[in-house]
Amino acid sequence: MQRLRRGLFLLLGVGLGILAITGLAAFYVDLAWFAELHALPVLWTRVIARWGLGLGAFLFALAVTGSNICSCWRGATLAGAWAIATGLSVFFAGSLSNHWFTLLLWLNQGPVGESDPIFNRDLGFFLFSLPFWETLQHWCFNLVLLTLIAVVLIYLVELGLSEQRLTLALSLYAQRHLLILGGSLFLIRAWGHWLERYELLYSTRGVVFGAGFADVHATLPATTLMSGVAGLTAVGFWALARQGIRLNLPFLKSWCPSWASSLLAPAILWGAYLGFGLLTTQLYPQLVQTFLVTPNELELERPYIEDNIRFTRAGFGLADVEVQPFPEGGALTWEILQQNQSTLSNVRLWDADPLLATYRQLQEIRPYYQFPYVNVDRYRIGGELRQVMHAARELDFAQVPPAAQTWVNRRFFYTHGYGLTLSPVNVVTPEGLPDFFLSDIPPRVSPRYPEVASVLRVEQPALYYGELTTTDVFVGAEARELDYPAAERYVYSSYRGSGGVPIPHLWQRFLYAWHFGDLRILLSRELSSATRFLYRRQIRERIRRVMPFLLYDRDPYLVIQGGKLYWFFDAYTTSSRYPYSEHLPGFPFNYIRNSVKAVMDAYNGSIDWYIADPRDPLIQAYARIYPTLFKPLEAMPEPLRQHIRYPQDLFRLQAQQFATYHMTDPRLFYNREDQWQIPGQFRNRRRIPMQPQYLILTLPRDPQGVANHTPEFVLLSPYAPVNKQNMVAWIAARCDGENYGKLLVYEFSKQRLIYGPEQVEARVNQDPLISEQISLWNQHGSRVNLGTLLVIPIETSLLYVQPLYIEAEQGRLPQLTRVIAAYEDRVVMEPTLGQALEALFLPRGSR
């Protein structure tokens, strides 16, 4: 027996030792990684807040559970009772400590400056305070409820389940004990009812999201009343605990056991509470909704519809949208086109998918290099703004030949991608391929475009951090890294950056080997005192590790500046707690701001965080929580700031929401008389919504007639009426300089028919010359793909442009073969955009 006991203690010691080393290794790996990013305050804030909240919750839960269990469990040792209480307290501490960031937001909140229309409370209460108080109330309720259940079980187990023993179990002491706990539950429930009043601002009962007539005039007073009823019920339980609760009524003795009569009085109180609650908070509001509101819905719900419109527009950043009539004027002419060459020279003829396929065929160079995505940006070249598309040439170790996928190659040799490929959006070679500004390995500027050399020079092309970079590598070691493959040899390099964690000591290697489950880290002779360990290099994982509370755009993009490469991220603050703001289907939030721009060095992995929207109350709270992390946007170097763009993900949400919430008149909104939608396009016989497009264009003149002569980078999406195909408006987000973030909507006259994208596509498909030519191509072993139809505003008119790609059925090299252009009721297809415009706007004899 003694030997068995020693064995058990040994196993317990070994298990605790393994847990301790695992925890220590994980903490050190995090500590070193955050130190590398100069973000240690972020880690320490997280650790202190989580453990501090957990410790406070543990002590409070231990006091509640321990005092109750010890007072009722007479047959147990004091140590045993406290052991059970400790186990329960650890559970409750862990559950509450997960809400540490809710606590920090509550402690660091600030006023929003806008109040809700029902309670007249600053919206900061709903964004910061209400989530914290609700979390605390739920936690306290569950703590007391579980304590009550534990106490009941202890009384029952201690004295058995016979009627005689149940009577003993429910002695006066036990009755008082249980009633005190029951009263405490009802007191916490009264607190919960009081908080539920504020939840009415997120009601879905009425015609719109948020509190409606029935909520305000029936549910709100009923919930307030229920808070008082729950409080009185708690007082009733405590009064019974003080006075005694057994009901000695003569008619009860014939059918009610003596132990059950002890439960009758609290059962009556509990039943009365439930019945009153069902009548007041469920039945009464439903009767008001059915018999009063529904027959008079618009009249009674009008003020609440107005609130929903106002707060939804505010929640999605649509309150300041500038709506203008699209200027009317003469027809689009050749002369007007010549005056808008900045727009025409940036018409995007390359779609992302065919361009990516072409990049992969022509520029990946080696199987282990991959282009994951194509991105859009703009550069000022030769004094003009030029829109470009590019893709990072990343290293995907999964594509290395299987025989070469050794541990040494994974950790030391294949360490980084190399450079990028970049081409203008509007230039096509005679072979129908993109004409590169920047290409090859090492990155080379095309001699045909010497003016881009100073802007697009890449002096540090190595990509140690990227979207496909999932391996952890050692750099600065004895082994040489592959820099890039040359014609007949490999060019080697050694990392000279500041990224990664130095691991000069054996104990550090031991902790990393333990954490990553890789003993070879400890045993490898390739490591030296100069070695640095680069881990968590996948850029999305890397940035989320630092700030998991932000929502990130799906499209990070690469920027060339000063010979170096940087990853740009758009990050959003979101909340589901904005009163009256309507959710979009499938999205959990009803408030969103693009409040943060993050920039990551692709060579060193360092991250800089910039506040792009200082008016956002959420990012201001974040900045108070992490005062050393965020910088003002003005601190971003000006050359980098020129590459900020309005994010597509946010724009999609705003455009979708504005399709309904451009209607600000409650009657118009209620009847959905002017509902819009994003037009569709057909791809593979399936209709999908059009995606917003980045364009460089000159915006139309303003309502005062002042002309705009400056080309700018904008994000644009058209609108059509619901169940119709004509175009009624378009929305644009400005991306440049002091106009960044401004949203413009241009509405067309309702007396004027404007062809929508779907109508133009239908006319393209019905054109006999175009459809005949497409059929001929499809019959000769080729596959024809129509690209995205672009809607291009030019002064007082709209021009439609659609590229056409051909690729062999056996190959994957799309070629841009034709360009389709349309204006009003004319459609043409020509080899180039210039020829298509000539065919549209020049008489035959003058071409």
Curated annotation (Swiss-Prot):
Alphabetic keyword roster: Cell membrane, Membrane, Transmembrane, Transmembrane helix
Membrane topology category: Multi-pass membrane protein
Pfam families, alphabetized: UPF0182
Cellular location(s): Cell membrane
InterPro entries reported in the protein's UniProt record: UPF0182 (IPR005372)
Main localization of the protein described in the UniProt heading: membrane
Gene Ontology CC terms: extracellular region; plasma membrane
Entry annotated with the keyword Cell inner membrane: no
Domain of life (superkingdom): Bacteria
Membrane spanning residue stretches: 7-27, 51-71, 76-96, 141-161, 168-188, 220-240, 259-279
HAMAP family xref list: UPF0182
Family: Belongs to the UPF0182 family.
The protein, known as: UPF0182 protein CYB_0372
